[in-house]
UniProtKB/Swiss-Prot annotation:
Protein name as catalogued: Carboxypeptidase Y homolog A
Intrachain S-S bonds: C177-C416, C311-C325, C335-C358, C342-C351, C380-C386
Entry superkingdom: Eukaryota
The keyword Transmembrane helix is annotated on this UniProt entry: no
GO cellular component term of the entry, any: fungal-type vacuole
InterPro entries documented for this protein: AB_hydrolase_fold, Peptidase_S10, Ser_caboxypep_ser_AS
Biological function: Vacuolar carboxypeptidase involved in degradation of small peptides. Digests preferentially peptides containing an aliphatic or hydrophobic residue in P1' position, as well as methionine, leucine or phenylalanine in P1 position of ester substrate.
Amino acid sequence: MKSLALALLVGGAIAAGPQQQVLQAPVDNPDVAEPPLQTIADTFDHLRGQATNLWNDVIDKVPNIMDTITHTPPPKKFNRRPDSEWNHIVRGAEIQAVWVEGDDGEKHRKVGGKLEAYDLRVKAVDPKSLGVDTVRQYSGYLDDNENDKHLFYWFFESRNDPENDPVVLWLNGGPGCSSLTGLFLELGPSSITEDLKVNYNPYSWNANASVIFLDQPVNVGYSYSGGSVSDTNAAGKDVYALLTLFFEQFPEYAKQDFHIAGESYAGHYIPVFASEIMAHKERNINLKSILIGNGLTDPLTQYPLYRPMACGEGGYPAVLDQASCQSMDNALPRCLSMIEACYSSESAWTCVPASIYCNNAIIGPYQRTGRNPYDVRTDCEGGNLCYTQLGDISKYLNQAEVMKALGAEVSTYDSCNMDINRNFLFRGDWMKPFHRLVPGLIAEMPVLLYAGDADFICNWLGNKAWAEALEYPGHAKFAAAEMKNLTIVDNKSKGKVIGQVKSAGNFTFMRLYGGGHMVPLDQPEASLEFMNRWLKGEWSAKSSS
């Protein structure tokens, strides 16, 4: 859903196995820690002193962590549909073989990138079959035939003017959460009721844009693979291939402006995916902006703001007592030193300990309260992911008639895959400094960070802090810009204050009042308001010049 496992995993919470809670309180019994400590010593005695010290700190905090590393999930069961059931199959090898003559008279490939291993299968979804929306729809798979990876997508055309409206790629986070939960829980054309009926959403983001919902990385949602993807950079290659082949099949959409939006762990994904696209000079992807909602992008700057958000300094009453707040303060210096070590080396040997230690010491106190980490105003209901609607969505998407209508090939749909979550963490991906890619993107396009102000796990305080700390040529102007009221301007709620915004050049930060981790769920009118205005270019270097 949201990128929801974010919290789960985030919590330090490495799930030692499917039967365990994602977040576990630190074990205080020193005897329990003895065997893992010996294992660490035996296995990593060749590491330099700093890495060994980091792992010792982790084992002290989470004694059973070694058991979780050795867990290997089974591959998803699937039944591949014959080619005859698909309306179109786009062969990456054929696209890669196309050469054109440039303005300089030299021949070059029509589009860049290694595409020969990829195919795109496309199914025209009958709008009447599911009733999710009346607009034109396509679903299907991107196949990486070399690595046995199959990414599922679902495209909805704009309700307004699809021949001219922009195209948006939506990504949930986790890592390991399906973007179809974003579709049905947040910003898609319909939601799912308790009796598994579709309920029209007047605030869907396809009101004025065509939207692609992508289940990535593999083994998330309807996507599947015999292997796995466990870091953001590897996932970026797949997303570039999917977009390239999709726009090759549908050139009528390729000519439109294209934007990437997502939330939570998409704060990792989006800088990488956008940078991957821009790295190809010859491309058919007309990328114009990126939007990150309640994201995790710069942990070193964001982690110090967990304590203020949990302890009453983020605009809502405190969730934690004074002792818990003090424990977070006490643990912060060590946490930050470990994140700094990760930033310095970007190695799993330093980044994994930082993730485990900081998530348990800094996020753990909040999660052990039973409060919703995605909304400080509510308790957690419906299991680890805290939203009962997720169960309804999973039941709906597991229906045979739904799977058939979409061409889904897996035996079951799950909203979030905790194995993926764990794999990303143990590759060190969690704490890596993906914010370092953002300055290069700001130089090329508008960048928006928006944050619902009731979220704990990727809270607005931390997102505002890293936005203001980011070093790039326009840093001083952005840091000095004032937060101004954000109001509705073009409907019956005209004049209603929905948040605050600060912007300078191509960089914008928004605080959305009353929104949790998933702003479109909690504040649908506000989310469509800022989205429509963003797509029109209201906050950009061009509009402010």
